From Swiss-Prot:
Lineage of the species this protein comes from: Bacteria, Pseudomonadati, Pseudomonadota, Gammaproteobacteria, Lysobacterales
Residues annotated to bind ATP: 109-119
Pathway per the UniProt entry: Isoprenoid biosynthesis; isopentenyl diphosphate biosynthesis via DXP pathway; isopentenyl diphosphate from 1-deoxy-D-xylulose 5-phosphate: step 3/6
Catalytic activity: 4-CDP-2-C-methyl-D-erythritol + ATP = 4-CDP-2-C-methyl-D-erythritol 2-phosphate + ADP + H(+)
Broad class of enzyme this protein falls into: transferase
EC number, as in UniProt: 2.7.1.148
Annotated PANTHER family: 4-DIPHOSPHOCYTIDYL-2-C-METHYL-D-ERYTHRITOL KINASE, CHLOROPLASTIC (PTHR43527:SF2)
Record's protein name: 4-diphosphocytidyl-2-C-methyl-D-erythritol kinase
NCBIfam families: ispE
Gene Ontology BP annotations: isopentenyl diphosphate biosynthetic process, methylerythritol 4-phosphate pathway; terpenoid biosynthetic process
Domain of life of the native organism: Bacteria
Active site: 25, 151
């Protein structure tokens, strides 16, 4: 099986530019346990960060302006782009006089449930907080990130985590090393439509971290809905089921299988039919961005 990577575009880093990782994530399970009075659903999930993802290129501006170079996501205007919104959110929260140019080198498929937009936004918050010397602590940055999306805080904290609430109540977890065979079916189903689907299970019995550690398989609440609605997702899960326990990440449409070692994942990749958008990524013990930030002097 030949590997087919998501398309990426590379920028030549010139004077003043710096490059920063924005890792992808997987949801090792996801269930909905109820609905709050404000209409949001109560979730339980485990976030697993990956040692693979997008790259955010940043350059500090002295004139206070925020500019996006190119398009992070095709068709998304600059004002609606999460990376631009993240930069403005930090700027307004701190009254800093500086600005930034932002370029996103995309590898994470859009609409796949791999957390690309949220991770990109978190990287912008963390790195500009350092480059602008605004010195907000992680808890404050995570609170800002939550205003952009429920998945942003886990990337700000940069750790694998058990999550509850709308996904923002995090308990750090130490997960064993693993490698993942990922597959992008190439379809995007709006999350709102999935939450409105009458067949979605919204009243699962609450689980515990102990249940997860014991190996209880909870699955993903969105998987049966996606299977029914999208033949591409059903096909992807069926193909992956030939090599292991296939799961959906997030609200889809991305799918994955976990393996103990990268060699096992690579062997499984070779068994897939040619031409699929499939690749292998290692699980990370924590966000690679934190390691990069730790080595930098600001």
């Amino acid at each position: 099986m030949g590997r087919v990577d998501p398309v990426s575009v590379v920028i030549d880093d010139g004077v003043g530019w710096s490059a920063w990782p924005a890792p992808a994530k997987l949801n090792l399970f996801l269930q909905i346990t109820g609905r709050r009075v404000d209409g949001y659903h109560e979730l339980q999930t485990v976030f697993r960060l990956l040692d693979w993802g997008d790259t955010i290129h940043l350059r500090v501006r002295e004139d206070g302006q925020i500019h996006r170079i190119g398009e992070s996501v095709t068709g998304v205007v600059e004002a609606d782009d999460l990376v631009v919104r993240a930069a403005y959110l930090l700027k307004h929260a701190t009254n800093v006089y500086l600005g930034a140019d932002i370029f996103v080198e995309k590898r994470i498929p859009v609409g796949g449930g791999f957390g690309g937009g949220s991770s990109d936004a978190a990287t912008v918050l963390l790195v500009l907080n350092a480059l602008w010397h605004t010195r907000l602590d992680v808890a404050v940055l995570a609170a800002l990130g939550l205003r952009l999306g429920a998945d942003v805080p886990v990337f700000v904290h940069g750790c694998n985590a058990w999550a509850e609430g709308v996904g923002e109540c995090l308990t750090p977890m130490i997960l064993p090393g693993a490698a993942y065979l990922l597959l992008d079916p190439g379809v995007c189903v709006p999350t709102r439509e999935l939450f409105l689907d009458p067949d979605l299970t919204r009243d699962a019995s609450p689980a515990t971290i102990g249940d997860f550690i014991a190996g209880t398989a909870f699955g993903n609440a969105f998987e049966p809905v996606l299977r029914r609605r999208e033949s591409a997702v059903a096909g992807a899960l069926d193909v992956l089921s030939e090599v292991g326990f296939a799961r959906v990440t997030g609200s889809g449409s991305g799918c994955f299988v976990e393996f103990s070692t990268r060699d096992e994942a690579e062997c499984a990749l070779e068994r897939l039919p040619y031409g699929l958008c499939a690749w292998v990524a290692d699980g990370a013990s924590r966000s690679p961005l934190l390691d990069v930030l730790k080595t930098m002097e600001f």
